[in-house]
């Protein structure tokens, strides 16, 4: 729906400033560390780590802070007073029924809603995780990627009800699938690149 799309866009835009700030802080930290310790610089690796820091910052703000926190914050910055609305701590919900079941069996969801919420809202959001984990942590293997992916997803879902969001079985499934797709994509790309050398 148009309202749902506007909400997703607004939520994304609200976390952009804090993500940029985190990126700037990380760059300053790396420059100081490299100069102080006279380290050699692998620019590709540094860029990947920078993107990973920005991605994690954005991800954490999208899924592990109250959904209206940043809109409240920017409202206060702009107007000098609070909206007075609650942030909704400990008001989260729980869903243990996959939405695909609701769509296929009960007909409660439209295919458009399912694609937007599940594929775009969940799976695509975690594909970068699967891509960047093996690039940032070079010695990580397939088994550890699977373990890390499921642990990150479970941790997020367990914490979400605390910040007024929902524990959702769909999120666990789609986030995990997104991470694995990202990992497989980067693995295939690396192997093809090595083959063509």
Which sequence ranges carry the predicted segments?
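Loop-to-transmembrane alpha-helix initiation sites
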Residues: 167, 172-173
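Bulky hydrophobic segments
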Residues: 2-164, 184-197
């Amino acid at each position: 729906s148009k309202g749902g799309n506007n909400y997703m866009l607004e939520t994304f835009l609200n976390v952009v400033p804090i993500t940029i700030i985190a990126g700037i802080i990380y760059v300053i930290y790396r420059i100081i560390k490299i100069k102080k310790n006279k380290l050699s610089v692998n620019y590709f690796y540094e860029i990947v780590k920078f993107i990973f820091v920005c991605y994690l910052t954005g991800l954490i703000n999208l899924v592990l802070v109250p959904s209206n926190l940043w809109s409240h914050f920017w409202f206060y910055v702009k107007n000098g007073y609070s909206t007075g609305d609650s942030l909704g701590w400990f008001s989260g919900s729980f869903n243990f029924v996959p939405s695909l079941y609701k769509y296929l069996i009960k007909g409660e969801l439209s295919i458009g809603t399912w694609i937007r919420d599940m594929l775009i809202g969940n799976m695509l959001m975690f594909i970068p995780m699967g891509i960047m984990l093996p690039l940032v942590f070079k010695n990580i293997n397939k088994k550890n990627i699977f373990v890390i992916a499921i642990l990150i997803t479970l941790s997020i879902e367990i914490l979400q009800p605390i910040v007024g969001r929902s524990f959702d079985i769909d999120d666990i499934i789609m986030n995990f699938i997104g991470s694995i797709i990202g990992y497989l994509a980067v693995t295939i790309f690396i192997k093809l690149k090595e083959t063509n050398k």
